[in-house]
Amino acid sequence: MIITDIEKIDNMAEQMCGNNPNLIAIDMNDYNRLKSSSSYLNATQIQMQCFLSEGIEQLKQAIKEFKTEGAHQVLLQICGVSSALEVHEIRFKEMCMILKVVEEHFEKNQVAEKLVLHVTSALDKDFCKNVDIVWGLSHRKSTEIIGREVNVIVGYK
């Protein structure tokens, strides 16, 4: 389900960027930069037990709901959720599968000739000519949900 309410998206960004021990960080600076350079935002949060075929299919269906026209940047956070203190594993292969789903959606719809993947704080306004995917990996503790979570915020011009 696509979230369009800016207050809900702000809350989601605070959860994404809050006090979580991030492995590769998306922080509030990234979100605020996206928010200030966008006329509007859309977001979604997908919770799943694993990134096997059913989880990836769930992600594909959720991503299809995003319109691509006018999209200029995507914040993507892949989060392991567990009740234990240790980080719930997110394997490199799983991370790549998720990035591929997001990339293919925007590429297939010809929003940009190419997508640029980079880690946060490498953002530069002159550099961002196409749709950028800014991504991060993190972990959070929860007593309710154990598994994995994918958070997506898309900024539109």
Describe each model-derived feature in a short phrase.
Residues 1-157:
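Tubulin/FtsZ superfamily GTPase core signature
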